[in-house]
């Protein structure tokens, strides 16, 4: 049994984390909740008990074994090292440490054994990947081990909940006022007057926005979401030379990120062998047609529409489609699964 802390215990994804800790019967002797000063003193119910939220900036983390951080990069950069210095193993769900070469970036089914188990953590911190990257990793791992992954071309279809409450409110707020006249869009894309967009660069209701994230000021024309796909895939899969081209798109879906993936390998790999491997892969469910609705609320990433890529010679290419719950496996679940693996070794 372990003593666990949840930092950033209030909010959208944090509720999912608390629910999962209960549902999975996490082996905790005690649980402490931490948040920003404005949430200090609030009461949260966990396992039938009311627990008072502590101030993450001033609380003493001594006595904790593991802390699950889901409070955003700004707080993580300051507080995660402070918790780690107190001897707490930190599993951080923000972007703060993903690029740090001394911090393992982990998907529980993919690289915990390689990068964490039996290793000394240089900074006492483990990073959780971006929710979009997360959906693809359990699918790509067994395929890479079988045939040697060389290149990925990916288009994402990212739910508005990936932008937080603001994204959810923007989609709902734009859809409600125009829903009765939506058929007019068949003939005239300017027929409806949407509320002005705030979160996105264009209306998201009944539309797509091929700009998820923010432009990176490096002349590449890429967004930070595009680059996360590349950088995180390389680090998690352990393929520093992996070629990755990504276009991340925001779509009018409330929950569930999806990816269209074209993968090129060094060796031939058949559709039949691919399905055999994925049927046995941890964290993966093989289906005919994955959708974000079907992925909502389940632990596994859904994969389907698997076919040979005719653009890659010698049977070395695959095309497939993946959907995953961005608030479940894409965030809270992976964090908890890492903590479960850590707890088993304590």
Swiss-Prot record:
GO molecular function: aspartate-semialdehyde dehydrogenase activity; NAD binding; NADP binding; protein dimerization activity
Residues bound to phosphate: 98, 228
Associated pathway: Amino-acid biosynthesis; L-lysine biosynthesis via DAP pathway; (S)-tetrahydrodipicolinate from L-aspartate: step 2/4; Amino-acid biosynthesis; L-methionine biosynthesis via de novo pathway; L-homoserine from L-aspartate: step 2/3; Amino-acid biosynthesis; L-threonine biosynthesis; L-threonine from L-aspartate: step 2/5
Alphabetized Pfam families for the sequence: Semialdhyde_dh (PF01118), Semialdhyde_dhC (PF02774)
Domain of life: Bacteria
Active-site residues annotated for this sequence: 131 (acyl-thioester intermediate), 257 (proton acceptor)
Reaction equations catalysed: L-aspartate 4-semialdehyde + phosphate + NADP(+) = 4-phospho-L-aspartate + NADPH + H(+)
Residue numbers binding substrate: 158, 250
Keywords: Amino-acid biosynthesis, Diaminopimelate biosynthesis, Lysine biosynthesis, Methionine biosynthesis, NADP, Oxidoreductase, Threonine biosynthesis
InterPro entries named in the record: Asp-semialdehyde_DH_CS, Asp_semialdehyde_DH, Asp_semialdehyde_DH_beta, NAD(P)-bd_dom_sf, Semialdehyde_DH_NAD-bd, Semialdhyde_DH_dimer_dom
GO biological process: 'de novo' L-methionine biosynthetic process; diaminopimelate biosynthetic process; isoleucine biosynthetic process; lysine biosynthetic process via diaminopimelate; threonine biosynthetic process
The protein's Enzyme Commission number: 1.2.1.11
UniProt entry tagged with the keyword Oxidoreductase: yes
Residues holding NADP(+): 10-13, 38-39, 161-162, 326
Stated role: Catalyzes the NADPH-dependent formation of L-aspartate-semialdehyde (L-ASA) by the reductive dephosphorylation of L-aspartyl-4-phosphate.
Family assignment from sequence similarity: Belongs to the aspartate-semialdehyde dehydrogenase family.
Record note on quaternary structure: Homodimer.
Protein name: Aspartate-semialdehyde dehydrogenase
Species: Mycolicibacterium smegmatis
Origin organism lineage: Bacteria, Bacillati, Actinomycetota, Actinomycetes, Mycobacteriales
Gene name in the database record: asd
């Amino acid at each position: 049994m372990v003593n666990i802390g949840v930092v950033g215990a209030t909010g959208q994804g944090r509720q999912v984390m608390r629910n999962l800790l209960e549902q999975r019967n996490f082996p905790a002797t005690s649980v402490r909740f931490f948040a920003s000063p404005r949430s200090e003193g609030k009461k949260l119910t966990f396992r039938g008990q009311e627990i008072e939220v502590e101030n993450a900036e001033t609380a003493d983390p001594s006595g904790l074994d593991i802390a699950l951080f889901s409070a955003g990069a700004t707080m993580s950069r300051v507080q995660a090292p402070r918790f780690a210095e107190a001897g707490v193993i930190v599993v951080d769900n923000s972007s703060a440490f993903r690029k740090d070469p001394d911090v393992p970036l982990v998907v529980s089914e993919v690289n915990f054994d390689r990068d964490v188990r039996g290793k000394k953590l240089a900074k006492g911190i483990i990073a959780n990947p971006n929710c979009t990257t997360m959906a693809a990793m359990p699918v790509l791992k067994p395929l890479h081990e079988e045939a040697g992954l060389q290149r990925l071309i990916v288009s994402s279809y990212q739910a508005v909940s990936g932008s937080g409450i603001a994204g959810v409110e923007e989609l709902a707020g734009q859809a409600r006022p125009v829903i009765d006249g939506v058929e007019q869009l068949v003939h005239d894309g300017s027929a409806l007057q949407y509320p002005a967009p705030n979160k996105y660069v264009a209306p998201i209701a009944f539309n797509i926005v091929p700009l998820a994230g923010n432009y990176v000021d490096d002349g590449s024309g890429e967004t930070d979401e595009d680059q996360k796909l590349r950088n995180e895939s390389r680090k998690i899969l352990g393929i520093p030379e992996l070629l990755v081209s990504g276009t991340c798109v925001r779509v009018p879906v409330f929950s569930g990120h999806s990816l269209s993936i074209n993968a090129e390998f060094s060796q031939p790999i058949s559709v039949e062998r691919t399905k055999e491997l994925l049927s046995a892969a941890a964290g993966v469910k093989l289906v005919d047609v994955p959708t974000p609705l079907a992925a909502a609320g389940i632990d596994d990433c859904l994969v389907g529409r698997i076919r040979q890529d005719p653009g890659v010679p010698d049977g070395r290419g695959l095309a497939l489609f993946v959907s995953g719950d961005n608030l479940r496996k894409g965030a809270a679940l992976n964090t908890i699964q890492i903590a479960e693996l850590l707890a088993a070794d304590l």
